[in-house]
């Protein structure tokens, strides 16, 4: 491979590990993966090194991407740099392996260049490289065991949860717990805002607009117990969609169309520009082929308003359903990179009041930090609930299909040693032999 043209940062000084072992919280995000260390009440974000040619690319926001070039797979920042350098020479890039998990099925394979590889294997390899980078950042031997709390989007299917958990374990991590991402953010928010976080009693709505997914969860928090009572989400709504909108405005204004590596580079440029927007910003000046393209913030917000409206509609839904049970949210907490957009906070404050809407101090790292807190807090309990309905499809006499729900969405999962008993009305089958078709879904009409 040729030498990278990308400027890189050097490795930072290693953080000492205290206690009996190495525990971390990991946020495997659509755009970036972030790791927080559980170090005796401190939860620093690790800067992770990845080798690329003769350089070390170090970052605390690891791109969740994989590249293939010249018979080799590369991961994270190395994959991103390789694609920018060698796109015209045959390098291929998956910008987000996490998006592949939305519709994952066992045995699913994808083609990268001339290589055919299973999604499960790609995911395992990405996590293995992540593990090596964690140990390297802390000057620990490759054989050191890492205990981790990980997270998934709140509306993840059982298949996505399974393949994520299995890939982490196959990569050598010892998984202590898997949490929903909004629950992780709630843990971080409570520890950030309250001095006596073990004596908190509050109802909190988490608005989590990440790179590729949106989740909102209504949590009832009492002392050290977190109960995610209601959850809604969209698997393909996130900051990446806002980046595409902004890039389309740049293309329109500059009369250009970006493809391949140039498009990937420009998406990075517009993302950085998007993250620089403040409540007082009027225009964005974006460098494009040695010229500055000016985009009015008003035009960008008009184009992106439908995405924000879609997310707020889901918040309204869970708040309304919770209020039917005589509950009222004390806080609406904004987390995730997409929540940094001023238009998001502005609309939510208009809807729910300025005093209720809060931005976290670490909106980009709240999930990783929350997971790290859980990793070293055995008394902190997060109740598990089913994220989707689960049932059996039945064909009626007229040929129509009906779903017999076995477990309803929101069903509290039992603790170890407990069982769930579910009673459903019986029906008389026409045959005493058949093929069961199971269904997992977010809603049933």
Can you annotate each of these PLM segments?
Residues 83-84, 88-94, 98-101, 105, ...:
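Gly/charged contiguous loops adjacent to phosphate- or pyrophosphate-bearing nucleotide/cofactor binding elements
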Residues 171-184, 345-370:
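Conserved phosphate-binding/catalytic loops in two-lobed NTP-binding clefts
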Residues 14-45, 193-229:
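Gly/Thr-rich phosphate-binding beta-strand-loop-beta motif of the actin/hexokinase/Hsp70
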Residues 2-21, 177-207, 366-381:
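Conserved phosphate-binding catalytic cores of ATP/NTP-utilizing and phosphoryl-transfer enzymes
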Residues 47-51, 81, 226-236, 254-256, ...:
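Short beta-alpha connecting loops at secondary-structure transitions
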Residues 115-129, 160, 178-182, 238-243, ...:
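Phosphate/oxyanion-binding active-site loops and adjacent basic polyanion-contact surfaces
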Residues 7-11, 174, 297, 381-445:
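Acidic low-complexity intrinsically disordered segments
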Residues 41-171, 180, 244-283, 439-445:
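Phosphate-binding loop and its immediate beta->loop->alpha context
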